[in-house]
Amino acid sequence: MDLKVLEVQKWLNLTYGNHPDFPAVTEDGLTGNSTIKALIRGLQIEAGVKVDGVLGSGSLAAIGTISPSLDTSVQTNRNKVYIAQGGLYCKGYNPKGFDGIYGSGMIEKVREFETDAGFISTTGNITPKLLKAILNTENFRLDEEKGDHQIRTIQQALNRSYSNYMDLIPCNGIYGKFTNKGLIRALQHEIGETVDGVFGSGTMSKCPTIKRGGAASKSVVLILQYALCCNKFNPNQLDGVFGAGAERAVKEFQEFVGLIA
C-alpha cells in the first residue's frame, strides 16, 4: 500500500463522492484503473464535460494545459492541480506535496516525466497530451525485469519525433502494441499516408522498397532500423543509413520468416 495513493483516493471520495457520476474509489492505497478513472472523472467534473472516465479529445480540450500559471485561488484550478499531483503520485513520481499548489517540486517531476517520455527540451507544464500519458497505468521508466535499453531509446525517439501524430507511447523498454502502432504511425507520416496506426493496403502501396543505394528517405530507413531492433534483428546502427548492417539484418529477417531474399 502506498500512503500517498491512499491520500489521493481519500481526497477524491471527499471531493467528488456526492456527484452522481462519480463511483466511490476503493481506499486501498493501490494504483489501478479504478483510481486513474476516478482522477479523470474529477477533471471532467471540473471542466464541465461528460463524466465517463475516458480522456478523449473533447475532455482534453476542455481541461487544457495545467501549469504554474493557473490561478489556484480559483477552486476549480486548484482541484485540477490536486488531480495532476495525484496522477504523478499514482505514476510513481513524487511532486513533493499534495496541496493543489503547482510549486517547484511539481515542476521538477513534470520535467522528469517529460524526459522519461523522450523529450530533450522540457517545460514543466502538463499539456493535454502529457496529461493523457500521466493518467494511465503504462510505465514510462525502464522495466527493471523485462525492459531493453535500446527498445526504450526507440520508444523515446518515436515520442520525440512523432508526438504530433500519436499519443505518447510507454517508454518501458518492452516492445508491444503501443510501440508497434507508433512505428506504423511514424511510417505513415513519412510516406504521406493517413496516420491511423493500421498497416493496410494504402500504407503498403505507398511504402517504398528499401535497398542499398535506393531512394528511401533517411527517416524511413531509420523506422526500418527501429522495427528490426524491436524484432531482435540487429542493424548495427540507428542512423537512417541502409548500410551493410541493415541489409544483413533484413536478410536474417527474411530467412526467419521464410521469404526468399
Question: Which residues are covered by each model-predicted region?
Answer:
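Cell-envelope/ECM-targeting effectors and their regulatory/trafficking segments
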Residues: 1-261
